[in-house]
Structures are given as C-alpha cells and as structure tokens.
C-alpha cells in the first residue's frame, strides 16, 4: 500500500484529509514569542495570523525537521507501506528537501520500501489539489 503525506501548507479541509487517508506533518510558527503548531486537526485562524503580520507582530515560521518526518514515516514503513510525500514549493520553504533527505536515510534502513518526496513548486490549495489528484490515482 502507498501512504500519502503532506504538510499543513496544503490547506486541505479535515474532511478531505480523512476521506483520502492523508497523513499531515505539521508546521510550527511563532507570533510574538508564542509558538503554536499548525496541524490538520487544529483550527488555524489565517485572518488573525495575517492581521498580526500586517500590524508588525514578530512572526517566525519553522521548517519541518527530519525528526518530525521520521516520526511520521517510520510507522508506515514498519507496517509495510511505501510513502509519497507531496510538499510545499522549495522556493518558499526547504521542507520538501528535508523530506527527501529523510527519505534517503530511511530507505537505507528499510531497503524494501520506497519513499518519494516531491516539491510541488506550489503552496496552499495548489499543493492540496495536486495531492488530491494523486490520491485518486495512486492505488
């Protein structure tokens, strides 16, 4: 079986994530020193976030690290599943590159499994739409 992964930048509604059995790796962000995790299960208040940005709040976003990818990928690999990760544009974030590096290391430990990490060259619903299309044809 193939397990699909993405990050929260795909901005997919939770109903579609569950319907298509997609695993979402969360981003973290900080607003004025307060760190939050933007996960698929969390209500992200985009209006408040961008209003804070416009008003000059100190905002930082965090790259998803290898540990978070490993934490998500390993249970699927151990269950005998291959993985396709569909990520945000490398022009915006290095997250897809980190996923690819993680994939390379994990395929050495699980040589019978395949992990493909894609940079979509898109973000938000552009990334999400690619993922949904893939979910319909990947089986």
Predicted regions: what is each one?
Residues 87-109, 129-131:
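Short Gly/Thr/Asp-enriched flexible loops that form oxyanion-binding sites at enzyme active sites
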Residues 82-90, 116-119, 133:
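Short glycine-rich or small-residue beta-strand-to-loop segments that form or flank ligand, phosphate
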Residues 9-10, 29, 88, 120-122:
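Short, ordered loop/turn segments at secondary-structure junctions
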Residues 137-139:
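Conserved small/polar residues in nucleotide/adenosyl-binding loops
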Residues 124-135:
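Conserved N-terminal glycine/acidic-rich loop preference
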Residues 103-124:
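Short, acidic/small-residue loops that bind anionic groups at enzyme active sites
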Residues 3-68:
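N-terminal glycine-rich anion-binding loop in soluble enzyme alpha/beta folds
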Residues 71-83:
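Glycine-rich phosphate/diphosphate-binding loops that line cofactor/substrate pockets in enzymes
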């Amino acid at each position: 079986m193939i397990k699909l992964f993405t990050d929260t930048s795909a901005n997919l509604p939770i109903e579609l994530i569950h319907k298509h059995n997609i695993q979402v790796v969360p981003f973290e962000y900080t607003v004025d020193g307060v760190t939050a995790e933007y996960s698929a299960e969390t209500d992200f208040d985009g209006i408040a976030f961008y209003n804070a940005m416009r008003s000059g709040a100190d905002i930082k976003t965090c790259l998803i690290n290898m540990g978070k990818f490993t934490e998500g990928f390993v249970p699927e690999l151990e269950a005998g599943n291959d993985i396709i990760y569909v990520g945000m544009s490398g022009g915006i974030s290095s997250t897809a590159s980190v996923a690819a590096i993680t994939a390379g290391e994990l395929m050495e430990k699980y040589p019978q499994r395949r992990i493909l990490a894609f940079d979509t060259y898109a973000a938000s619903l552009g990334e999400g739409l690619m993922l949904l299309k893939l979910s319909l044809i990947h089986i």
